[in-house]
Amino acid sequence: MDQTGVAVVGSINADVTAFGSPLPRPGETVIGDDFSLVLGGKGANQAIAAVRAGAPTYMIGAVGEDKFRDLTLTALAAEGVDISAVRITPGATGIAHIRVDALSGQNNIMIIPNANYRLTPDDVESSLTELRDRVSVVLVQLEVPLSVVQRVAEVCHTCDLRLILDPAPAQPIASEAWRGVSVVKPNELEAQVLTGIAVKDRRSAELAGRWFIDRGAAVAMITRGERGAIVIGPDGVEEYPAFPVTPVDTTAAGDAFSGALGASLARGASLSEAARRGLAAGALTVTVRGTSPSLPRAAAIDSFLAAQC
């Protein structure tokens, strides 16, 4: 039985991205620099990140019966992601409208879920049960219904699958879901929204991490942008510095981290090694414009890490 695969339960979107600087204020129109229309969604991004990082990857999600269906499914399949568990539903595919500041690389995003909210708990349970002998790690985010997230946690707990929860966009989840979470990976703002603790330094990050662990998560991994990440677990607290790079687009950094983290854990890496590869993947991603086009391959991550020694 080969369980080196990763299953990703999450959103599949068409990303409509505008680049320019400065970003417009309310009521203001500005002239931009560039535009892209590509596959996106936190689920799809993490699936591509995982498969590029070297893991057999299975996408579980939903798209609509519109012109963006072929764009999204073709892009996933072209990367080698297994799309047999992607449902095609009536209506529109999910859309993300992204604006990226061309100078800082920072962004803001508005998501219209569409088909992503038509994914059901039963759909997901059926797919995960079928995949349980091929995967050991499951990634999930909060761009699908919370009832789906809860069912994913239940199935992972029952089937002894390692679940990585990316709680974005941040919103409360059912208390009973936490016991199925192996790693919860919020950024500082998401950690603050969920815990009520303003994460500003190591001490506050540790307090926020303990909040997640007290509710049943095994490990909390709080990402801090250019300050790296802090991992809080049963063996204590470990701080990982970020790799210095010049960002041009930070949109997919968190998804690159999650995908590389999941792929590394599925191949048997330690949490420490997997976290370092996740940070490297995130660092490489912010140096390239676009969401899925920016996600690095395993060889690029290897070379980047080798250059840091």
What are these regions (language model features)?
Residues 1-62, 67-71, 77-78, 246-248:
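Glycine-rich phosphate/adenosyl-contacting loop at the front of the ribokinase-like
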Residues 48, 95-99, 108, 228-232:
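Short beta-strand scaffold segments in enzyme catalytic cores
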Residues 1-6, 172-177, 202-309:
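Conserved phosphate-binding/catalytic region of the ribokinase-like
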Residues 88, 98-137, 142:
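Conserved phosphate-binding/catalytic loop of the ribokinase/pfkB sugar-kinase fold
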Residues 48-56, 100, 263-268:
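Alpha-helix C-terminal capping segments
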Residues 107, 124, 136-207, 227-229:
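Conserved beta-alpha-beta core of the PfkB/ribokinase-like small-molecule kinase fold
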Residues 75-90:
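A glycine-rich helix N-cap at a beta->alpha junction
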